[in-house]
């Protein structure tokens, strides 16, 4: 394997986890005391996890070496690659046995532990991936098996304690992060302020810092530095931006997954609730000067106009278990009193209004998915950047100025907001880099996609469309447009 840290770490850690699973599975027969039903579930959990890790390995590295026994001090100097059939046979068998023995509710009420729906979801995924390798089971195509498992999970969602939200916004609502009803399998982040958080090693969970751009690159109009950004967090890495291809996959006129995936309008914030920053503080409310308007291409008629904070951020002290959490509420448009009683809770404060209105006065910069002409930009009292202008002809991001004034707007990009958590218990603010929400490994929507792909592969295009349309409808911005299309 490569010595590159990320890929090597994935490979090594997957095998380390497999070794633990092997120990649980193989030592279970030696356990003579305790509740046999509990033991059965623990073994089923280990089989589900072992199958998952092997699925990760075969997906990323191809034919790896199957190991089903606990490691010893003896090193295997010449490991042999197992065949696709051997690897998938183990994955399928583990998941079938796990699904048979797991309950629909998690052991000890710990929602982070795998249940029957997790095993079934992964089984459908494994069949679909194996089908792509041309595999079959007793003469039956893996596509047929993927169809059967996925459709059973869909048809019997309630009995498996599975769920699909009617509105895609609810999937990413901050209040739904913990115990998300659509989740089949998660990587659970610890509740900030608890002993599990305090004594665990969770400082490395900084994913959002890599997927967000830094609006402070426009420091004269966005004066709050990354180390003091209590709203977005310390977004100082800025490595991962969506490709031109990915951006073009969205038709944001109809698809509200766009703003529920990417933040494209950036604002300042007040901290009235915390008593740290008033509503009209110079770092919360900006007045457009002639110089700022000239520099950023804002029409001169907006000189003297104020841009107000979009949110107010509260500071909630964690006491002896850490620093503060910074939870945001939204100032309604047109509300300038600074009265915290007027604040409203929204599903996700990082989901900006879309499309951004011409008269919006709570955002400093807007990255527009739809191309805005100069005349259209002139109607807006904030910085407008066409996302298409961020890309060169070869589809790569430009690395130099995109405007005549040579501003740093070229450093901005649509920012993936799915790892930027903002709820009490999911945001540890000691250095504004660590956020500890739950992350999906698999959710129910994927099962619909698997069912659709399997049906299409088996020649049932109309049935495939039915499954796809369930997902399309809940993502559609206006139901009337969905019905018309």
Task: Walk through the language-model features, giving the residues of each.
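An aromatic- and glycine-enriched ligand-binding surface/loop that stacks and positions planar moieties
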Residues: 1, 125-380
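Conserved, well-structured interaction surfaces
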Residues: 1-61, 76-89, 95-111, 385, ...
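Short coil/turn linking the two alpha-helices of tandem helical-hairpin repeats
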Residues: 32, 58-59, 63-65, 106, ...
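TPR-repeat structural position
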Residues: 14, 88, 140-143, 461
């Amino acid at each position: 394997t490569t010595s590159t840290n990320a890929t090597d770490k994935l490979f090594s850690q997957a095998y380390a986890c497999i070794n633990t699973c092997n120990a649980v599975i193989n030592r279970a027969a030696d356990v003579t005391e305790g509740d046999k039903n509990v033991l059965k579930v623990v073994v089923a959990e280990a089989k589900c996890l072992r199958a998952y890790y092997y699925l990760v390995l075969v997906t990323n590295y191809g034919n790896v070496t199957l190991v089903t026994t606990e490691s010893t001090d003896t090193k295997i100097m010449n490991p042999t690659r197992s065949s696709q059939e051997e690897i998938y046979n183990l994955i399928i068998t583990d998941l079938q046995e796990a699904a048979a023995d797991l309950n629909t509710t998690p052991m000890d009420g710990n929602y982070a532990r795998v249940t029957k729906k997790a095993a079934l979801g992964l089984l459908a995924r494994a069949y679909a991936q194996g089908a792509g390798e041309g595999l079959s089971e007793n003469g039956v195509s893996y596509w047929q098996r993927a169809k059967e498992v996925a459709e059973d999970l869909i048809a019997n969602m309630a009995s498996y304690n599975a769920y699909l939200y009617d509105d895609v916004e609810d999937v990413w609502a901050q209040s739904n992060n913990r115990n998300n009803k659509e989740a089949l399998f998660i990587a659970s982040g610890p509740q900030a302020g608890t002993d599990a958080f305090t004594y665990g090693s969770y400082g490395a969970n900084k994913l959002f810092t890599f997927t967000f751009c830094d609006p402070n690159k426009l420091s004269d109009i966005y004066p709050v530095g990354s180390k003091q950004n209590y709203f977005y967090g310390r977004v100082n890495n800025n490595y991962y931006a969506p490709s031109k291809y990915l951006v073009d996959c969205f038709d944001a006129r109809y698809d509200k997954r766009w703003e529920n995936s990417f933040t494209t309008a950036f604002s300042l914030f007040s901290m009235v609730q915390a008593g740290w920053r008033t509503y009209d503080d110079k770092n919360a409310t900006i007045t457009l000067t002639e110089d700022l308007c000239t520099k950023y291409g804002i029409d001169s008629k907006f000189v003297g106009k104020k841009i107000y904070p979009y949110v107010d951020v509260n500071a909630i002290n964690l006491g002896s278990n850490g620093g503060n959490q910074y939870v945001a509420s939204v100032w309604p448009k047109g509300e300038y009193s600074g009265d915290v009683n007027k604040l409203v809770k929204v599903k996700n404060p990082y989901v900006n209004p879309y499309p951004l209105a011409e008269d919006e006065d709570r955002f400093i910069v807007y990255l527009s998915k739809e191309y805005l002409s100069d005349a259209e930009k002139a109607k807006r009292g904030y910085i407008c950047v066409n996302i298409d202008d961020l890309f060169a002809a070869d589809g790569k991001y430009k690395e130099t100025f995109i405007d005549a004034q040579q501003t740093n707007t070229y450093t901005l990009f649509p920012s993936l907001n799915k790892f930027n958590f903002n709820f009490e218990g999911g945001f540890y603010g000691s250095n504004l880099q660590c956020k500890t929400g739950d992350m999906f490994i698999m959710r129910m929507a994927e099962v619909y996609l698997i069912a659709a792909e399997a049906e299409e592969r088996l020649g049932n295009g109309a049935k495939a469309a039915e499954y796809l349309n369930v997902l399309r409808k809940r993502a559609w911005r206006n139901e009337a447009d969905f019905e018309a299309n």
